[in-house]
Each structure stands twice: as C-alpha cells, then as structure tokens.
Amino acid sequence: GHRPFDYILANTDKDMVKMELDLAWATKAKQDPVALFKLHPGRFPLWHVKDLDKTTMSPAEVGTGIVDFKTIFDNAKASGMKYYFVEQDGAPKPIQNVTNSYNYLNKLLHA
C-alpha cells in the first residue's frame, strides 16, 4: 500500500502544501525520516522533535531514546525544515526534562 501523505504530496503543489513530521512516531513506525526528506524534498518544514525510550517505547528526553537525531539534523536542508518543536508527552519533570532535551540539542547542533 501507499502512505496517505505520499498520495497527498504527489498530488498537490509543492509550494502550497507542506507536512509536519513527528520524528519519534515516524521512527517507531519504522519510517526513516531522512528517506522521507529525500523522497519529498522541501516538504517537511515543521518537525516534532521528540524521542521514545528504547525499552518501553514511552516518551523520553530528546537524545536518550530510539531517534537518530544527528543523522536527521544533518539532513535538515533536504527536508526544508524551518522550525522544530521539542516535546516530551507526559514529562514527569517538565522543566528538567525540557532543559535536558535543550542541552542535548544545543550540543548536537553546535558541535
């Protein structure tokens, strides 16, 4: 079968229709975000940057779980990424959790 968003992107104007990709859920669904960026270049300007625990698959701090953020961010240009939103659903310690996620991303992006 075909993914619904492949159909949508194949049949809409690339300058008018863009997508927002949740990196954690795409990864969990065994969808490679970088492959999606290459298949639909410039169509993913918005990202949900979140992670899932390697064992429980529950939401985790960014950089501690299953998502390969280095490879994904290395391909940001191909995606057309303009903005990303850092999330952790049900964060047990929201301020500490988002601070840890921020610190991870800051180190990754400014290495």
How would you describe each model-predicted region?
Residues 2-18, 25-111:
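Histidine-acidic metal/acid-base catalytic patches
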